[in-house]
């Protein structure tokens, strides 16, 4: 979902469009509950919760829903929030690799549904570690260009810990260590620069370019996985050219 990937750019646009869907809201709420359970209800002392809440607010989750999720997760309502994080690894078309991040209250259900979605859509489950080494955990901020140059963005965020700024065509993507993400957001705010999304993601060290057929199959696989309630995120090293993107959009 990162780098100069056409899939990444499409995904971030899709995330904004889909932000009002109930499924998207449920996943954001689940993130908040887990972060509050792990680190407590205080945003100032819980960076994971602060990130989860910021993301939820950015995608228009109502404040009441957010507050209730924090209280549930922190155990202030008497409800038990018991989710397990699981990462599955898979191979897709033409040598592409996928990491499937799950948050579930039923490990058997998650395993069954993920495996079924992969096998039905042309992928194969990979052994633990055989795919994950291709990715690094990074803070990733996506922002529209709005007339900005790459140097403008870099100057705004360099002292906040930014490692690089990538040009994705219509947008820029800032990479940092996960812990520097709040400082990056604050630096952008101070510079008057608006951003679309900020995430902690698994970023591929190298990308695999797919042709039209491979990209079509890959999108089918990725979409099937993301439709699953237990799947929070899908990361991949798949990429495709402008020509392949245009061909897919014309179908």
UniProtKB/Swiss-Prot annotation:
Keywords: Cytoplasm, DNA-binding, Transcription, Transcription regulation. GO terms for biological process: regulation of DNA-templated transcription. It is found in: Cytoplasm. GO terms for molecular function: DNA binding. Coiled coil: none annotated. GO terms for cellular component: cytosol. The keyword Transcription applies. InterPro entries: Integrase-like_N (IPR017856), TACO1_YebC-like_2nd/3rd_dom (IPR048300), TACO1_YebC_N (IPR049083), Transcrip_reg_TACO1-like (IPR002876), Transcrip_reg_TACO1-like_dom3 (IPR026564), YebC-like (IPR029072). Belongs to the TACO1 family. This is Probable transcriptional regulatory protein Achl_2034. It comes from Pseudarthrobacter chlorophenolicus (strain ATCC 700700 / DSM 12829 / CIP 107037 / JCM 12360 / KCTC 9906 / NCIMB 13794 / A6) (Arthrobacter chlorophenolicus).
């Amino acid at each position: 979902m990162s780098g100069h990937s056409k899939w990444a750019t499409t995904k971030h646009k899709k995330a904004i469009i889909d932000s009002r869907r109930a499924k998207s809201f449920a996943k954001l709420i689940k993130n908040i509950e887990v972060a509050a359970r792990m680190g407590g209800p205080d945003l100032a002392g819980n960076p994971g919760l602060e990130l989860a809440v910021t993301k939820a607010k950015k995608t228009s989750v109502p404040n009441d829903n957010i507050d209730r999720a924090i209280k549930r997760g922190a155990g202030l309502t008497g409800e038990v929030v018991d989710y397990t994080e699981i990462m599955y690894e898979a191979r897709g078309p033409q040598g592409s690799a996928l990491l499937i991040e799950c948050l579930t209250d039923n490990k058997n259900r998650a395993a069954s549904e993920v495996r079924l979605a992969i096998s039905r859509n042309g992928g194969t489950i990979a052994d633990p570690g055989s795919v994950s080494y291709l990715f690094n955990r990074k803070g990733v901020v996506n922002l529209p260009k709005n007339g900005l140059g790459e140097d403008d963005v870099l100057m705004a965020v360099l002292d906040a810990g930014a490692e690089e700024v990538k040009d994705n065509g219509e947008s820029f993507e800032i990479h940092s260590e996960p812990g520097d993400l709040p400082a990056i957001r604050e630096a952008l705010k101070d510079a008057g620069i608006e951003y679309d999304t900020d995430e902690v993601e698994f970023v591929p060290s190298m990308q695999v370019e797919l042709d039209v057929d491979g990209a079509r199959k890959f999108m089918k696989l990725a979409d099937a996985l993301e439709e699953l309630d237990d799947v929070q995120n899908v990361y991949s090293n798949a990429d495709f050219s402008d020509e392949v993107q245009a061909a897919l959009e014309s179908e």
